[in-house]
Amino acid sequence: MAQNNVYLILFLCLMFLSYSQGQVAEEDFPLAEKDLPSAKINCPEGANAYGSYCYYLIEDRLTWGEADLFCQNMNAGHLVSILSQAESNFVASLVKESGTTASNVWTGLHDPKSNRRWHWSSGSLFLFKSWATGAPSTANRGYCVSLTSNTAYKKWKDENCEAQYSFVCKFRA
């Protein structure tokens, strides 16, 4: 058994050496990375792709709970979870480019037990934070989170969950 492993290692070393010296052509490796088909993300009309998800801005104004339920009924999604600065920039751009006049747009971030422990409605881990100055508020506590137009939709503010805002749904492509 050990002898077979030695032969395998020797073979792999020789192949690597030959390849690195240009003696083995790329055509000898039919499944080279450049030949693999790229994954095309198909989102429904009106939705935009980012990563492996589709994002859909809904301009109708609903409460946070109604908005999340709407997203769940739409392709088994949730209100948008924003997990990185890059995703935050994408969502902000999506909202701005829509031409919406909404001053606030719901995200999926909420505090379901009103104890200042924030959770994404999708179940994603809450690691990335982008709170607006003074948020979350200690004086005017809200338990649902929106993006605000006065921060170009890049910063978060805690709001009353019964307020009615436009929202962004996020679902797997």
From Swiss-Prot:
Expressed only in regenerating islets and normal exocrine pancreas, but not in normal pancreatic islets. Expressed strongly in pancreas, weakly in liver, but not at all in gall bladder. It comes from Mus musculus (Mouse). One of its GO terms (biological process) is suckling behavior. One of its GO terms (molecular function) is carbohydrate binding. It comes from the Eukaryota. PROSITE patterns: C_TYPE_LECTIN_1, C_TYPE_LECTIN_2. One of its GO terms (cellular component) is extracellular region. Residues 41-171 form the C-type lectin domain. Residues 1-22 form the signal peptide. Might act as an inhibitor of spontaneous calcium carbonate precipitation. It is found in: Secreted. It holds the Pfam family Lectin_C. Its main location: secreted. This is Lithostathine-2. Keywords: Disulfide bond, Lectin, Secreted, Signal. Disulfide bonds join 43-54, 71-169, 144-161.
